[in-house]
Amino acid sequence: SIVTNLSGVSAGGLVAYTKLVTPILNSSFALALGLYVNNLLPGITVKAIAVVGICILFVLNLLGMDIFAKVSKILSTILLITMVLYVVFGLTQIKQPIFQFSGDKMFTGGFKGFMLAALLLINSANGYYNILWYGKDAKKATKDVPFASMACVPCLLFIYVGLAMVTGGVLPHDEVAGAPTILPAAQAILPGAVYKIFMIGGPIMAIITTLNGVFNDVRYPLAQAAKDGWLPKFILKENRFGAPYLIYTYTLIVVLIPIVTDMSIVTITNIFQVITFFMNVTVVYAISRLPKRYPEAWAKNKFHFSNGALYTFC
């Protein structure tokens, strides 16, 4: 609705239909969950864990927003505490020259490897954007949503940079390069029992919290698209807990398809980037039109800055 209002009907339709395929990204998170749990339970395949995990979260989200919010708070708190403790401890264990940028171990994958790593990082740090979809249910949307979104920045900087430094600094390059997870580094510096606790409270919890939000991240855009006439209105049907079960079921199917067809995490990520590039450009262009479409409201905005600064930011 926002994009349609600011940029026209065609732009709104592009965003609406793009949202039909964006859940595919969460297939990579489900597979990552499988990789981590498989390290604790090697008798269960990665694919089976991924499928069962996303199905459990699907059922959980069918129980309504209240359950979703309570579970998210608990899981996120455990995750934050675990990651901060691991980074703080891990920084004291660094033995490799991680800041020797001219060394032969830097940028071994060349420009292509660097860009692929950057794309993976972007995909892992887009939660701040998805907070926007919760504005409808927020008690003080104009205050809480911007604050929550901006609060993600320092958290991401500390945790992601810290994890990268620890993972690349505690073991020789050859032992961690190309590793699909941060587990080799964690296993090297943590005692056995502590390592397993870290696995559950850190990586596994991080993936679960991400997957837990996928259904609601898709719910609001698709529901609004249906209300605006882009999608059939029957998908708005809700169960007795207020959950749009048809939208959730569709989301589940989209997430499961790449898993059961054995797509790699990198392939899923690249597909997602191509699909969402045009949507993101459309959204940014719409934002740049705010001063022209709503000059008075823009001038009174709490986060107001000059038009030139807005265009530069966009």
Model-derived segments and their meaning:
Residues S1-G8, N39, K70-K73, W133-F147, ...:
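Short amphipathic alpha-helical coupling elements at transmembrane boundaries
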Residues V15, L40-I67, L79-F89, S124, ...:
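Transmembrane alpha-helical segments of multi-pass small-molecule transport proteins
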Residues L57-G64, M83-G90, Y160-G168, V255-D262, ...:
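Structural signal for membrane-spanning alpha-helices in multi-pass inner-membrane proteins
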Residues S1-G8, N39-L41, M150-N212, L231-T267:
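TM-loop-TM module centered on a large, flexible mid-protein loop between adjacent transmembrane helices
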Residues F234-Y245, N280-C314:
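C-terminal membrane-solvent junction of multi-pass transporters and transport-like membrane proteins
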Residues S10-A16, K47-V52, K70-L80, F114-A117, ...:
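Alpha-helical transmembrane segments of integral membrane proteins
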Residues S1-L62, P203-Q224, S264-F278:
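Hydrophobic transmembrane alpha-helices that form the core helical bundles
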Residues I74-K196:
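Helix-loop-helix junctions that connect adjacent transmembrane segments
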